[in-house]
Amino acid sequence: IPYESSGFPYLPNGIYKWINVRQNIIDAQGKNKTILDIGCGIGFSTAASHGSVGIDTDEDLLTKAKNLFPEKRFEYGNPLFWKSKRKFDIVTSMFYLHENPRYIRKKIVKMALETAKERVVFVDLAPDYFGSDELLKRKPFLKDYMLHCREDLIDFEEHVIVKGRLHMWVYEISGS
């Protein structure tokens, strides 16, 4: 049975405890890291540390993000064309890859690897996630993502966050 939660952006941790997986991922990167968040949505996955920025292509989501998190920095940015004048310590993307067709996912991965100094972290649905028919209708690229995400992220180390639901892929940049 797929997990449906009204506790967004939290995941259950035991019966009465909830964890904010996005914030835990950000915190795990270390203090004072500059983090680029690709596909930031309404900003929960964007770090507040100085020099960090969240990018997204949806102006409405960016407006909501700026209102929710005035202490964070957000920019309009299409990962196919967005170019940074500098590199970031860490590049993250959370719950975004499955929203895109494969050719765009590959470009997102390439851009992330070119922009990160230390590591790239992708957090998304598990490849064996069982999505409802309704979810599959709303997420047209989900099936393709589940079929190809491991192949597309073959150079990344895969970690299970919630079995059958949520995985993380990490690529450590050599020499960092």
Describe these PLM feature segments:
Residues 116-120:
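Short glycine-dipeptide loop
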Residues 1-34, 41-82, 103, 121-173:
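Class I (Rossmann-like) S-adenosyl-L-methionine-dependent methyltransferase catalytic domain
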Residues 64, 111-114:
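Alpha-helical scaffold elements within enzyme catalytic domains, especially in hydrolases
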Residues 100-111:
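A short, conserved alpha-helix within the catalytic core of class I
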Residues 96:
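Hydrophobic adenine-recognition pocket in adenosine-nucleotide-binding enzymes
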Residues 92:
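A conserved beta-strand element that flanks and buttresses the S-adenosyl-L-methionine
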